[in-house]
Amino acid sequence: MSDYGEWAVIVPFRSLDVAKSRLAVSCRRDLALAFLQDTLAALTLSNHISSVIVVSRNAALSETIGTPVIKDQGSGIDDAVEIGHRWLREHGHDGHYSVVMPDLPALRTGDIDNFLSAASRFPRAFVADSAGTGTTCLTTQQAAILSAFGRNSAQRHTRMGYKQIPLGLPSLRLDVDTIDDLERAARMGVGRHTQRLLISNNELHSLRFPCAPG
């Protein structure tokens, strides 16, 4: 349906103050930032992605992460998606859009490439999380982005006409919300920012996460 080489990606990142509240460690703020940085690192290596922006209440993050940050003035993920979409259109992007969650520290560029290749055959597509109930990534080739992120979003996105891509894509499905999720990601192999924290942070190091090469 499309040449999938011109995807613009929106990464909604609420704020460091409220991110990863279910991670039962005191360094959750540092982990949230590391997850975001590793997610962005994988995205920016893709030849199929023309631009990546982050939408966040922490607009000053841009200097830290090296990615444009658009000020989030909404009340949730879907508002952030709309803010990012509007900004991209105002700045000349009229191609295809993807939304990727910011908590994919094990993300491999190959998985996002495979997803975009498969998604290019459908007007709208998405990937469910490892539990099969949430959404880690969606795409649209239409003028507007309609999204319904949150609990049980996979079911809602299906009802909205998004095609679920049934590929394995393990690193794209593994969003990290809990310590158990983080252990699974560590076994898969996380990016360098998360791996550095797992090794250097005393609290995390004491949990003895397995650190496979990212």
Curated annotation (Swiss-Prot):
**Which EC numbers characterise this protein's activity in its record?**
2.7.7.105
Example GO molecular function: phospholactate guanylyltransferase activity
Pathway per the UniProt entry: Cofactor biosynthesis; coenzyme F420 biosynthesis
Which top EC class is named for this enzyme in its record? transferase
Q: Which residues bind phosphoenolpyruvate?
A: 135, 150, 153
Record's SUPFAM superfamilies?
Nucleotide-diphospho-sugar transferases (SSF53448)
Q: Which InterPro entries does this one have?
A: CofC (IPR002835), Nucleotide-diphossugar_trans (IPR029044)
Q: Which UniProt keywords apply?
A: GTP-binding, Nucleotide-binding, Nucleotidyltransferase, Plasmid, Transferase
Give the reaction(s) catalysed. phosphoenolpyruvate + GTP + H(+) = enolpyruvoyl-2-diphospho-5'-guanosine + diphosphate
- According to the UniProt entry, the coiled-coil residues are none
UniProt similarity note: Belongs to the CofC family.
Functional note: Guanylyltransferase that catalyzes the activation of phosphoenolpyruvate (PEP) as enolpyruvoyl-2-diphospho-5'-guanosine, via the condensation of PEP with GTP. It is involved in the biosynthesis of coenzyme F420, a hydride carrier cofactor.
Q: Which HAMAP family match?
A: CofC
- What is the protein's given name? Phosphoenolpyruvate guanylyltransferase 2
| Organism in which the protein naturally occurs | Rhodococcus jostii (strain RHA1)
Q: What is the lineage of its organism?
A: Bacteria, Bacillati, Actinomycetota, Actinomycetes, Mycobacteriales
The gene name reads fbiD
